[in-house]
């Protein structure tokens, strides 16, 4: 039986955090037996914001090690670096030439990012969705795991594919969104109205996967909650609901069991319990990561093999696209 293909990308910037892990990476790991997974470290996307070259290279390998430590299995999945496969940029240019300006101008993420970085607005940032579309369409992808903030970009990708197929003949699969039921949107510990983000610089905003036990405990103790002091799954209690979501994913307990466990107990006790569950859950990941960082040659070999595997698919698609549009 042929497995459905899933494409997922993650930028090698900032520190990979609990939101990335619970909202994306854990689902990637859990789905490896079910799907034909392609995981891409999207370093070309990263340079839409000016990066320190040496740090970007280091972060790229660090992210690869973290993903492998989280359980990405190269016997079941493909992991590679975006810039190692030239067809991503080449297809993005062809798509650029087939996307109306109006469609790109409506992308809300460009507006948000350009407001945050008004001195660094570049064409790459504006064209970001075209490269994302190329990433996805290059591999004839069936499903793309997306959070709410990326749904608009996937809708553009679908529109681009449908328009291209209509104008040039059937070429691309039309990808479907895959939105996880739990953990899709882990919020910031300091401000639970905002999604946990790698680009947020505040020290108590998120839990990095490589944080020490002491750092994790301190951050959870300082997490924003409310004055009700009731540990219950009430979405209106946004701070405590966020912590409950994290706790439930790490423990696997039902809502009823968790609420009964902490009935009559204060937020302080609950916060420590969440921290302990996270520390215990991240321990094997951190141990595997420590081993992998000592094996740079192995990391490079794994990533090179991954690029070699996906390049075969990418070249086949790009060759067909070139022929469709009349390029030699």
UniProtKB/Swiss-Prot annotation:
Q: Which terms are listed as keywords in the entry? A: Aminoacyl-tRNA synthetase, ATP-binding, Cytoplasm, Ligase, Nucleotide-binding, Protein biosynthesis
Instruction: State the span of motif ('KMSKS' region).
Output: 195-199
What EC designation does it have? 6.1.1.2
Where is motif 'HIGH' region found? 12-20
Ribonucleoprotein in keyword set: no
Mention any one GO cellular component term assigned to this protein in its UniProt record.
cytosol
Q: Name one GO molecular function term.
A: ATP binding
Family membership, please give it. Belongs to the class-I aminoacyl-tRNA synthetase family.
| Protein's name in the database | Tryptophan--tRNA ligase
Organism from which the protein derives: Wolinella succinogenes (strain ATCC 29543 / DSM 1740 / CCUG 13145 / JCM 31913 / LMG 7466 / NCTC 11488 / FDC 602W)
């Amino acid at each position: 039986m042929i497995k459905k293909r899933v494409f997922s990308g993650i930028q090698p910037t900032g520190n990979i955090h609990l939101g990335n892990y619970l909202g994306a990476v854990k689902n990637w790991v859990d789905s490896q037996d079910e799907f034909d997974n392609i995981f891409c470290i999207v370093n070309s996307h990263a340079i839409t914001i000016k990066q320190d070259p040496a740090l970007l290279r280091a972060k790229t390998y660090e992210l690869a090690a973290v993903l492998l430590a989280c359980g990405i299995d190269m016997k079941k999945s493909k992991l590679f670096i975006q810039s190692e496969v030239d067809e991503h940029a080449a297809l993005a240019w062809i798509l650029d030439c087939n996307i109306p300006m109006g469609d790109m101008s409506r992308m809300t993420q460009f507006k948000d990012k350009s407001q945050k970085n008004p001195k660094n607005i570049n064409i790459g940032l504006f064209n970001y969705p075209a490269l994302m579309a190329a990433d996805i369409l290059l591999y004839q992808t069936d499903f793309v795991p997306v959070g709410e903030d990326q749904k608009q970009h996937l809708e553009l990708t679908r529109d681009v594919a449908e328009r291209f197929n209509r104008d040039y003949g059937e070429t691309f699969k039309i990808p479907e969104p895959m939105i996880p039921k739990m953990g899709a949107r882990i919020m910031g510990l300091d401000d639970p109205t905002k999604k946990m983000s790698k680009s947020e610089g505040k020290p108590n905003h998120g839990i990095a996967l490589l944080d020490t036990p002491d750092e994790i405990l301190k951050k959870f103790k300082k997490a924003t909650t409310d004055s009700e002091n009731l540990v219950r799954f009430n979405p209106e209690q946004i701070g405590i609901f966020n912590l409950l979501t994290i706790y439930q994913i790490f423990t696997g307990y039902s809502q009823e069991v968790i609420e009964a466990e902490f009935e009559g107990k204060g937020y302080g006790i609950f916060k420590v319990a969440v921290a302990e569950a996270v520390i215990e859950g991240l321990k094997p990941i951190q141990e595997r990561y420590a081993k992998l960082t000592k094996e740079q040659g192995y990391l490079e070999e794994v990533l090179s093999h991954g690029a070699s595997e996906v390049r075969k698919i990418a070249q086949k698609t790009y060759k067909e696209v070139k022929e469709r549009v009349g390029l030699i």
